[in-house]
Each structure stands twice: as structure tokens, then as C-alpha cells.
Amino acid sequence: MSFVLILSLVFGGCCSNVISFEHMVQGSNINLGNIVTFTQFVSVTLIQLPNALDFSHFPFRLRPRHIPLKIHMLAVFLFFTSSVANNSVFKFDISVPIHIIIRCSGTTLTMIIGWAVCNKRYSKLQVQSAIIMTLGAIVASLYRDKEFSMDSLKLNTDSVGMTQKSMFGIFVVLVATALMSLLSLLNEWTYNKCGKHWKETLFYSHFLALPLFMLGYTRLRDEFRDLLISSDSMDIPIVKLPIATKLFMLIANNVTQFICIKGVNMLASNTDALTLSVVLLVRKFVSLLLSVYIYKNVLSVTAYLGTITVFLGAGLYSYGSVKTALPR
């Protein structure tokens, strides 16, 4: 498959996924994060099910696993917890642009966890770029809608446009990002030990997590009901059948989520890690700009400078990653 088509899946799927999600939460007083996460897990499970089943016998059964079940279960815990946290942060007054910016600190967290847990060593350029990204993320978060001033350096969070609610939201994003960093390191170890069976990992990470959603069945039911009654209706394109707008965007979000995941995995299998990192970085930048432009999200000049700093640091890290992390 051509590189252009793969890039189209990555940019089209991932950017559209961000836009469809923001369209659902924009101007809404209800939290839809759990129902979005649940439907995404169901969709990916169903789409990946044919790859996981052995059709040579009846009744059909799951194919033999290449990776131990306990490894899948640990990955499920990290992935599920991180996904639920990421999709729930918007009820804490965190906008999509700020969400994207903070998640860029994942490189720094991965580096710290890799050094502390996996005994990895990193080049000076990688460490410097990680510090640059972290500083940029902090600046963009603290001064999201107010400009920097000397008075704002005092510890009164209100002076920089922060509240206890939004600060807790930032904490949730950071925890979710740290869990994803742990998951990345776990997957790296798993692929090195058991082989690069990413399709198996993708299926089990979603399939095994489905029972966990039953712990919040009441919340899922209420969110789905609110999704239907709190939304205007629209006509489905082509067939012209009426449907709740937010429900339509939920379906679109699930479709674009699969396209995004497929494009990223295809890109990972057709190029090197540096190119993948650069492409995903540019994709995040495009998502950020689209969110600000389409939904008129406000970012101060200081926040823009912080954003530029984040992506500058990420670019330097991508360049420095040509020399991979060395074991101690």
C-alpha cells in the first residue's frame, strides 16, 4: 500500500477522531467520556475478532496466543485505566488543545520511567529535548487563556487562569500519560520477548477490558440516555434518516478511531521509528490547529509560545532518537 494512502489514514482518521470527539463534548454539561471509551473498545474488538478466531474448526475458537495471558491482562489494566482517564478529563474544564499539549509530555515520562524501571540510558540531546517539551507543556497549561506576567509567578493559581478543578484535570491527564508510557515500555519488552504480534495485542487489550465496563453499567446507561435526549437531530447523509447529532458523531468517532489505529500500525510496519515519531508529531500539531480553528478555542500568545516549544522539543527528540536508547 502506498505511503500516501497510509499518511491519509493517519491524518484523516486521527484528526477526524479528535474533531468528532470535541463536537460531542463542545457546549455539553454531561460527561460522555465513558460511553465513548466503551463503544471504541467494542468496535475495535468486533473489527479485530476475525483475526483472532480460528475458523478451521466448529465451533469457532480463539487462535493460540503468542503472548502469555497475564501479560495481556497487565496491558489491559494500563490501557483501560489510561483510556478512561483520558476521555473523562474534559469534565474538569480541560479543553482539547490543552489535552493534546499535555499529552506531548509522554516522551519525558517515558524517558523517566525507562531510566528508573528499565535501566535505559539516553543521549544528551534526548534529555535536553525532553526538558524543553516539559517546560513548553507547563507554560501552555498554566497560561492557557492569560498572558504571562511577573505577578503571575506567585503561587495563586487564579492569577494564571487555573482553578482547583482544572488543576486536577491536568493531574488526571498526566497520570493517564504515565500509564501509557508504562504500557509502551511493556509492549516493547513483550515484542522483544514474544515477537511483534501487534494484532493479537490490539484485540486482547480491548476484548479483555470489556467486562471492566460493567462496573460502571449505570453510568454507561445514563450517559447513553443523555446522549440521545440532549442532542439535536440531523439527517444521515445519503439515506436522509433522522438521528441524534451526538449519536451520529459517536458513530463517526468509532469509525475514525479504527482508521486512526489502522493507519498508525501500518505506518509502524512500513517505516522506521524516527519517521513514525515525526509523522505523529505533525499529526498532533494539525489536530491542535484544527481544534483551535474550528471550535474557536482560545489560547493566549504565551500558550502559543509554549505550544511551539513543545513541538520544537519533540522535533529535537525525534532527531536525537536516531541513536536509540542504550542499556546500562
Swiss-Prot record:
It holds the Pfam family UAA. Keywords: Golgi apparatus, Membrane, Sugar transport, Transmembrane, Transmembrane helix, Transport. GO terms for molecular function: UDP-N-acetylglucosamine transmembrane transporter activity; UDP-xylose transmembrane transporter activity. GO terms for cellular component: endoplasmic reticulum membrane; Golgi membrane. It is found in: Golgi apparatus membrane. Its main location: Golgi. The chain crosses the membrane at residues 1-21, 30-50, 66-86, 98-118, 122-142, 166-186, 198-218, 241-261, 274-294, 298-318. InterPro entries: SCL35B1-4/HUT1. It comes from the Eukaryota. Disulfide bonds: none annotated. It is a multi-pass membrane protein. The keyword Mitochondrion does not apply. Sugar transporter that specifically mediates the transport of UDP-N-acetylglucosamine (UDP-GlcNAc) from the cytosol into Golgi vesicles where glycosyltransferases function. Belongs to the nucleotide-sugar transporter family. SLC35A subfamily. This is UDP-N-acetylglucosamine transporter YEA4. It comes from Kluyveromyces lactis (strain ATCC 8585 / CBS 2359 / DSM 70799 / NBRC 1267 / NRRL Y-1140 / WM37).
